[in-house]
């Protein structure tokens, strides 16, 4: 029987966290928890209800009435109160404002509690900005992914084109730099590498190379 460890993968926007985490979870037959999708879902409910992204109390009130759940599949489905929001939470409107919503302490605290419940049984791969430091500080394996702004903008540009979104590469670079600033400098649970996390610079690596490196590290933890 495979030992059910918890794997935390953190890093800045477009560092490849979600793609790699999905591959690792599938290979290990673990559950993948996309915490970024949870923050995007909250941003979407603010948008849908015409609530200002800066209005922490109003968004928190909405969140208290909101059920966010995941449904496994070839592409993991995300539901908000039984509405399938898998695609809409990746819209440019949500993408450009999720860091504002994610900076609210009340929202981070509420979602961190939900994320910790998901992890109680182990056998999970969770990616985000503060998994190794705040959500799963006792995770058996912590990874911190890095990549240059140029590399991350190029990846996001290709993703957007594949989804049919028009994109401007220079604008994407600017947006990623702004998002980095918000993520690294927010007061509550900022993006930072846990002391015991293993840093992986993915700038010159393929997705499979990154996934295989993490799988190798995971196997060592599982066998210990």
From Swiss-Prot:
Keywords: ATP-binding, Cytoplasm, Kinase, Nucleotide-binding, Transferase. It is found in: Cytoplasm. The keyword Glycoprotein does not apply. It is an enzyme of class 2 (transferase). Gene3D superfamilies: P-loop containing nucleotide triphosphate hydrolases. The keyword Cytoplasm applies. ATP binds at residues 11-19. Its EC number is 2.7.4.25. It holds the Pfam family Cytidylate_kin. It comes from the Bacteria. It catalyses: CMP + ATP = CDP + ADP; dCMP + ATP = dCDP + ADP. GO terms for biological process: nucleobase-containing small molecule interconversion; pyrimidine nucleotide metabolic process. Transmembrane segments: none annotated. GO terms for molecular function: ATP binding; CMP kinase activity; dCMP kinase activity. One of its GO terms (cellular component) is cytosol. Belongs to the cytidylate kinase family. Type 1 subfamily. This is Cytidylate kinase. The lineage of its organism: Bacteria, Bacillati, Bacillota, Bacilli, Bacillales. The gene is cmk.
